[in-house]
């Protein structure tokens, strides 16, 4: 029996999706634009292992051209690009669709840039959480709003409420002055109160520091998601006696549904070390599922092109270590959940095609084309683990 190791490079899109114009994202290309930026600055992106596994070819399949500094090479894995069927370009939609369940309904959104949340909801939150007030109530970058309101938050003990183009209600609070457990309790109550609004996630955003220029978000972020609308590959594997090891924020994204073991870790090195530890002990018939969040939160949303490039190069250096821990029957999958082009306007996600790079001793190298849904990965995993087929998605041929 096989094991699958799925690493989600959160936000690593490889070219604008066919419907990107509906999202204002036509022309977005996270990988391509990072490569172009580094090439123009005389420091071409160095990703030999990702290239070996088919990244450059998947990008060419997605866009019709090689990224700057990349060219045709012999690949040692199966590669494809995939479009998203789900209605949104958010984290839960992307991950659920990867596991076979596209989101065909429309999420609720708080669309007003200022005074974003309904007064009735805010009043309910203050009462239920025994709060005297709040700050924010707007669309904002998570780091910028700390600079603007962090000191006032410490003085007042009012939590900071904010949102974005995603279906989210985010709450920032100081770990010491407000309290981490108190923040989690507030988020749990808000999660219950916003059910009528069909919001995908409430996110706890704890931070530390004592003034505007040194506030820093911590690794104690917690996402409060709704359950996927249907059973995912995770459920099917568990039901058949298999094991799902969720690393990083994966368990939060699926609201714990279908997760056998949740491993908390942070930072690229910490998350990949946790993945290696899981690979050492995981039995056959196990899915090891890791989200590498920093690509998105630290570099994509913050439009930090250099930081994103460095993180990609660091990840690339990890790949031989991951591969050396694989058994002969293991399948490694490198993919993403949406784009977040650091060269793009604004701070939000971008609607993009994603890479699907599959490798292992039993995987035949080559082009698997342009896929019509992220759910093709879920169907592929069903076939790998000999599970009942998902309703959507077409399995990728591995050999």
UniProtKB/Swiss-Prot annotation:
The keyword Manganese applies. Pathway: Carbohydrate degradation; 2-deoxy-D-ribose 1-phosphate degradation; D-glyceraldehyde 3-phosphate and acetaldehyde from 2-deoxy-alpha-D-ribose 1-phosphate: step 1/2. CDD domains: PPM (cd16009). Its main location: cytoplasm. It comes from Idiomarina loihiensis (strain ATCC BAA-735 / DSM 15497 / L2-TR). GO terms for cellular component: cytosol. The keyword Nucleotide-binding does not apply. Mn(2+) 1 binds at residues 10, 337-338. Pfam families: Metalloenzyme. It is an enzyme of class 5 (isomerase). Its EC number is 5.4.2.7. It comes from the Bacteria. Keywords: Cytoplasm, Isomerase, Manganese, Metal-binding. GO terms for molecular function: magnesium ion binding; manganese ion binding; phosphopentomutase activity. This is Phosphopentomutase. It is found in: Cytoplasm. One of its GO terms (biological process) is metabolic compound salvage.
